[in-house]
C-alpha cells in the first residue's frame, strides 16, 4: 500500500481540488496511468515486451496518457490533468516531478540508445511543454507552458 498512499498524498498536496482519497482514486487519470505503468514496466523489464505494450496501450485509451513501458519513472511523481501527455521509452523521471497535460518527453528520431529526456528530482514541466531528445532537466528546474526544450536545463532554473 506504500506506493498508493504516497501517490494519493502527493496529489492531495499539489492539487487543492483533490478533497478525498476516494475522489483521487476514481477521478485522477494520472494516478491510474502511473499505476498501470508500474505493471507495464515490470513486464517490459522481464521480457514480456508485447504484453507490456498491449497493457500500456489499453491504459492510454482510458487515461489519454501515453507512457512507454520502457520509461523509468520513480515513485513520487505527480501527473496533473494528464490528457495528451507522452513519455518515451528511454525517458527517466525522478521523484517529486510534476508533469501537466500535453507534456511530451520525446525522442528526436530513430537513434539507438538514450534518446529521451531525463527529468531530475523536483522539476516541474508545465502544460504543453515539449522536451525533446536526450536532454536533462535539472533538479527543481521549471519549464514553462508551451516551451520547446532541446538543450539541458540546469538545476534550480526557471
Describe these PLM feature segments:
Residues 60-158:
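Structural signal for interior beta-strand "rungs" in well-ordered beta-sheet cores
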Residues 1-63:
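Terminal amphipathic alpha-helical/low-complexity segments used for targeting or macromolecular assembly
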Amino acid at each position: 500500500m506504500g506506493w498508493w498512499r504516497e501517490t494519493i498524498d502527493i496529489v492531495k498536496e499539489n492539487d487543492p481540488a483533490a478533497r478525498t482519497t476516494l475522489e483521487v482514486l476514481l477521478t485522477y487519470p494520472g494516478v491510474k496511468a502511473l499505476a498501470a505503468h508500474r505493471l507495464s514496466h515490470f513486464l517490459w523489464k522481464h521480457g514480456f515486451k508485447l504484453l507490456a505494450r498491449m497493457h500500456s496501450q489499453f491504459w492510454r485509451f482510458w487515461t489519454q496518457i501515453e507512457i512507454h513501458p520502457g520509461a523509468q519513472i520513480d515513485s513520487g511523481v505527480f501527473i496533473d490533468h494528464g490528457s495528451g501527455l507522452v513519455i518515451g521509452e528511454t525517458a527517466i523521471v525522478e521523484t517529486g516531478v510534476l508533469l501537466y497535460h500535453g507534456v511530451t518527453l520525446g525522442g528526436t528520431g530513430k537513434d539507438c540508445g538514450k534518446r529521451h529526456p531525463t527529468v531530475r528530482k523536483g522539476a516541474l514541466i508545465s502544460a504543453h511543454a515539449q522536451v525533446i531528445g536526450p536532454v536533462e532537466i535539472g533538479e527543481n528546474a521549471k519549464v514553462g507552458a508551451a516551451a520547446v526544450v532541446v538543450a539541458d536545463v540546469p538545476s534550480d532554473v526557471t
